Swiss-Prot record:
Organism: Desulfuromonas acetoxidans (Chloropseudomonas ethylica)
Subunit note: Monomer.
Keyword terms, alphabetized: Electron transport, Heme, Iron, Metal-binding, Periplasm, Sulfate respiration, Transport
Coiled-coil residue windows: none
Keyword Metal-binding: yes
Protein known as: Cytochrome c3, 10 kDa
UniProt subcellular location: Periplasm
Residues involved in heme binding: 16, 25, 28-29
Biological-process GO terms, alphabetical: anaerobic respiration
Annotated function: Participates in sulfate respiration coupled with phosphorylation by transferring electrons from the enzyme dehydrogenase to ferredoxin.
Molecular-function annotations in GO: metal ion binding
The organism's place on the tree of life at top rank: Bacteria
Amino acid sequence: ADSLTQFDGIKGRYSHEAFYEEKACDSCHLNK
């Protein structure tokens, strides 16, 4: 959750969505 929050704050919501779409699986595992 922290990583996603920081990424969203730095890159912006649009970039966050693109990042999540590309690495949704990795994000879920890393953040959970």
